[in-house]
A protein has these predicted regions:
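Walker A/P-loop nucleotide-binding motif
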Residues: 48-64
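Conserved nucleotide-sensing/catalytic segment adjacent to the nucleotide-binding pocket
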Residues: 87-127
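Post-Walker A helix-loop "phosphate-sensing" segment adjacent to the P-loop in P-loop NTPases
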Residues: 69-80, 89
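A short, basic N-terminal segment
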Residues: 1-42, 47, 207, 211-234
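Conserved AAA+ ATPase "SRH/arginine-finger" region at the nucleotide-binding site
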Residues: 148-160
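Short regulatory helix/loop adjacent to the ATP-binding pocket of P-loop NTPases
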Residues: 131-146
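Conserved AAA+ ATPase "sensor/coupling" helix adjacent to the nucleotide-binding pocket
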Residues: 148, 162-175
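C-terminal helical "lid" of AAA+/P-loop NTPase domains
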Residues: 182-186, 193-207
Length: 234
C-alpha cells in the first residue's frame, strides 16, 4: 500500500455571472472623477447639448455613461452604424461609448450632432482622447466638437481604487480584510478594468482552494498575472 500523499481535489468554481453594479448608488467618487460625476448628476442642465467625457482606459467612463444612459433613457448608438440610429432617435438623448476607438464616422457623427441639437436633446460621447486629437478632417464636425463641453476623468487614485475593489468583492459577496485591499491598491495597475480582473481571479482561486482571500494569496495572484502581462493589457 503506497504512503504517497495526493493533493486534495480542487473545487471547480461555477461561473455565477457576477455582474458589476452600474447604478448611481454603487458609484465610488473621489477627486479623480468628481467633476465627471457632477456633470452626470446635473443632467439635463448641461452647459452644451454635446458633452465629451475623456479619460484613459479603466478610468470608469463606461460606468458613468451607463448610469447616465439609464437616467436619461438614452439610445446607445453603435459607432459603426451612427446613420442608422438617427431616423429612430426622435427627441431621446444619445450615447456613443468609446467613440474614438476606431476611425470616427465623421459624416454620421456630424448628422447625429445636428439631429440632437435640432431636437433640443443631448448627446454624451466617451473617448480616451480629447476631440482635438481624433484627427477629424470634416471642418463642420470639427466646429461642432469645439462647441461641445469636454470633461476629463483621470486614472483612479488610491481612494477610488480601494473603494472599487471593496465594492467588487461585495458584489461577489466576498469579505476581504482592508489590509488586503490596500495591498492590491499598491500593487496593481491604476485601472478599474484591471481591478475587475484581479478580483475575479482572486475569487476563483480562493474558491478552487477553499481558502479565504489573504494578503499571501493576493500577492501570489498578482505576481502570476504580472508574469502574463497580456492579462493586464487593456
Amino acid at each position: 500500500m503506497s504512503d504517497q500523499k495526493t493533493d486534495p481535489p480542487r473545487q471547480l468554481p461555477l461561473d455565477l455571472g457576477h455582474g458589476t453594479a452600474y447604478s448611481r448608488d454603487d458609484l465610488v467618487v473621489s477627486g479623480t472623477n468628481a467633476q465627471a460625476v457632477a456633470l452626470v448628476d446635473r443632467w439635463p442642465d448641461w452647459p452644451s447639448p454635446v458633452v465629451v467625457l475623456a479619460g484613459p482606459a479603466g478610468s470608469g467612463k463606461t460606468h458613468l455613461a451607463s448610469i447616465w444612459r439609464v437616467r436619461a433613457n438614452a439610445v446607445a448608438v453603435d459607432t459603426r452604424r451612427i446613420g442608422d440610429n438617427i431616423a429612430n432617435l426622435g427627441a431621446r438623448p444619445a450615447l456613443i461609448d468609446d467613440v474614438d476607438t476606431g476611425a470616427v464616422d465623421e459624416q454620421g457623427l456630424f448628422h447625429l450632432i445636428n439631429a440632437v441639437r435640432g431636437a433640443g436633446s443631448t448627446l454624451l460621447l466617451t473617448a480616451r482622447r480629447f476631440p482635438s486629437a481624433w484627427g477629424v478632417a470634416l471642418p463642420d464636425l470639427a466646429s461642432r466638437l469645439k462647441a461641445a463641453a469636454t470633461v476629463e476623468i483621470h486614472e483612479p487614485d488610491d481612494l477610488l481604487l480601494a473603494g472599487v475593489i471593496t465594492k467588487l468583492f461585495a458584489d461577489r459577496q466576498v469579505e476581504v480584510e482592508p489590509h488586503v485591499v490596500q495591498y492590491l491598491v499598491r500593487r496593481i495597475e491604476r485601472s478599474l478594468a484591471t481591478a475587475m480582473r484581479v478580483v475575479e481571479r482572486l475569487d476563483r482561486t480562493a474558491l478552487e482552494r477553499k481558502t479565504p482571500i489573504t494578503r499571501t494569496l493576493a500577492a501570489e495572484t498578482v505576481s502570476a498575472m504580472d508574469e502574463g502581462q497580456g492579462e493586464f493589457e487593456i
